[in-house]
Amino acid sequence: MQRPLIAVLIASAFLTLNAQAADLIQVYQQALANDATYASARSSLVAGEERIIQGRSGLLPNISASGSNLRNNSYNSGPDTVFGIVTDSRTKYHSNAYTISLAQPLYDWNAWQTYQQSKLVQANSEATFSQAQQDLILRVAQAYFDVLTAQDNLTSTQAQKVATTEQLASAKRNFEVGTQTITDTHEAQAAYDLVVAQEFAAINDLDNKRTALAVVIGKSAGELAPLRTGVTIEPPSPAAVDPWVSSAESQNFSVVAAGLNLEIAKREISRSRAGHMPTVNLVANKTHQYNTGVGQPGNTGNNTAVGVSWNIPLFSGFAVTSKVRENIALEDKARNDLEATKRQAAQIARQSFLGMTSGLAQVKALEAAEVSSKSSLDSNKLGYQVGVRINIDVLNAQKLLYSTQKDLSKARYDTIMNGLRLKSAAGSLREEDLQPINALLQH
């Protein structure tokens, strides 16, 4: 009765552990809330949204109010103009003045180009943020599958350790009864020592991968949902590389941002040339002033002025011409940056496509190799028992099987990641693309 009860408890604990394991979508949601790099990009987007308001302000009226309140105290001494008698006079009064001014640009090429440029700056911030969103998806998925890869490596290494331990014990028993030489024992001991060292390395690698995931999600990572056994990874659609490369050269968000940087550079040239152009403003102001105090008769005055002001720059020490040349060079730089970004995006798309297609073939080959390796191990174990195989044959078969299993799991993860990188390079990666991958996990 106790053994079935223990089995039920173990099974329940296993199911509870899986129920608590976080899947890829849940980890991504944690990263959305806690990743510092993504939060920085979001703040940059909010800041960029203010640029249009700032750029438009140069085309709108500028209204200001000013005023003064002065206390005047004057003393005069001199002969009276009628009787010639020296007299003193003292005057104390307050003078007050208030002015409201308005200036509306009628022609300001610099302000207009600044406004047009602000639209491009905002669009650039949006493209940069979209790229940051894609980068977050890639970083989360990469960190997630890095942890799974490390876990699989550790599991395989520990299984290999158990098998090697059994083989070492068998070699020692056979040596004691005289059916095998000490060489078999030494070979098994060497294999055991090696797998113990590999286990320590695998444990350390798993800790490092969990730490890397914690950096993205902002807290220690718990249990993660593993990939289901024998999953089928969908091939890329379209199945040709050229459409992906074409999309990467035009729709990749880094390419879009670089193109906007080029347009911004062109507008900057126009802005700098505005230093040679006149500015015309409609101006209006109204002034009200009055005086009060002892010895100063109260008086009030109002003045209203409406007209046009203009300014024509004549010479600025060649600063404007130099600024134009500088911005022309920066425009050329932006054009070259755009071309370099296009080439890089196309290269990533091509590499990711080839990596995914070759990865699918590699997964299929490794699945067949795993079956063959298991059969080889079983055959070598049987041959060892009947005396037609030696200990090193079994050890090599074990090593081949576990190495194949490690390669197979890594090939699956790499193929999935290449699919995500391919969509990112083409500018089409979205949060929804994690759903089919999440469905491959064991929930």
What are these regions (language model features)?
Residues D135-S247, G355, G359, L400-Y402:
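Periplasmic alpha-helical coiled-coil/stalk elements that build and connect Gram-negative outer-membrane
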Residues Q29-A39, V46-P61, T99-Q117, A127-Q134, ...:
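A glycine-/polar-enriched beta->alpha junction
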Residues Q20-S68, S74, A221, L227-E263, ...:
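Bacterial Sec-pathway N-terminal export signals of envelope proteins
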Residues S40-G55, A132, L136-T155, E166, ...:
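Amphipathic alpha-helical coiled-coil segments
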Residues Q26, S95-T99, Q142, E187, ...:
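Transmembrane beta-barrel architecture of outer-membrane proteins
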Residues M1-Q20:
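Gram-negative bacterial Sec-dependent N-terminal signal peptides
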Residues S66-Q104, L227-P238, S270, V283-S316, ...:
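Small/polar, glycine/serine/threonine/aspartate-rich low-complexity segments that form flexible
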